[in-house]
Amino acid sequence: MAGIEFKVIQNGDSDRRFIWLHGDEQTARMALENHMKKNKGKAFLVTGVVREAEFFGGIIDPNRIFSSEGAKENIQKYNRNWSRAKKREMLEIINKDRPMFLSKILPKNGGLLVALHNNFKGYNVRKEIGKSDATSIKKDQNFRDFYICTNRIDYDILAKSPFNVVLQEKLAKRDDGSLSWAAMGHGVRYVNIETRLGWLSQQKKMLNYLEKNLK
C-alpha cells in the first residue's frame, strides 16, 4: 500500500481479518502474533518499528491513509518541506493503491475486522465518549483499556464483557483517514482493541474474549 509493507499471517480459511498498523505499538504485535498461532483468520502486520512509516523519502501515519481527505492532511502534516507537486503526486499514489489494499484487508460476507493498538500517556476511553453512540464503562477497568466497535450487535455482546467498550456507529462528519471510518463506509464490522503499551496479558484477554463471543 503506497510503499508501506505488511507481513501476512494466515491460519485456515476464516474470513476474519486482523490488522496492526503502528510499528511502535509492540504489545499489540505480540498479542496478535500469539493469537494467530491458535485462531483462524488472516492478519496484516506493518513491517516497521516506528509509528510513522517511511514514504517516498518522507513519513506517513499508516492509519490516516484510508480516505483521500485524511491522506492529504497526513502528507501535509509530516512532509511540509515537499513541493505542492510532490504532495499531489504522493496523494495520487495513495488514492490509486487504496481500493486494492482495502479489498485485501476488509472481510466479505459480514466478517469482522479487528485492529489492535496500544496507547501512551493521555489517550483513554473518556476521549471517545463524546463521539460515541453508546458506552459501557466498568468501574474496575483502567480507562486506557477498551474496545471501540462500529456494529451495535457486537457492542451489545462486548458490553457484557468485563472490559470497557464504546459504540461508534455513525460516520464522522470529518473523515480523518482512519481505518475504522473506511470499514464503516464499506459496511464492514470493525473492532479496535486498545490497551496500554506493555499490558500484554490484558490485550490477550480482550482479544480472546472477542474471539470466543463475536461470530
Q: Predicted segments — roles?
A:
Residues 1-215:
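Structured catalytic-domain cores with a bias toward divalent-metal coordination
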